Amino acid sequence: NPTSLNTVRLTTFRRENEVVVLTSLLRMGRKGSKVDNVSVGGVFCEIENSGKLKSPAYGINPTGVYEENDFGLKYDGVVVPLFQQIVDEAKSMHMTLPYTRIIGWDFTVNDKNEVVLIELNLHSPGVYQLIGPALGNYTDEILEMVRQSKK
């Protein structure tokens, strides 16, 4: 959406000596909106490891499932600019925060084609169940880590 600040939300998990991406999605505002927040009508769409969007996009309303944006552009297969750079930057920054296991990162690409970190979410990284298991292939590992920390 050209009227809103659209952001890439990555959720990363720090394992012992590496950082992995749990989920990645593009958050987009709707026509005329300046923000991409789902709570005010925005939508989100999964980003595959290749950096391409995977339809559909979802909104906050349970019936809010979209194959295309308000301008008629189909989401499926659209390439997110500088996606690999965004992933690399999130992983690199996460390694500097050794006591934080899961972080939600919000990035955008500015009009100069530069990756910009908007914020990181330490307390509530966001859970986007509609695009698949929130903890992905690391579910068992993360749950075991939580169980061990309770002892």
PLM region spans:
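Phosphate-binding site of ATP-dependent enzymes
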Residues: 1-57
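C-terminal active-site "lid" helix and adjoining low-complexity regulatory extension at the edge
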Residues: 65-91, 95-100, 109-151
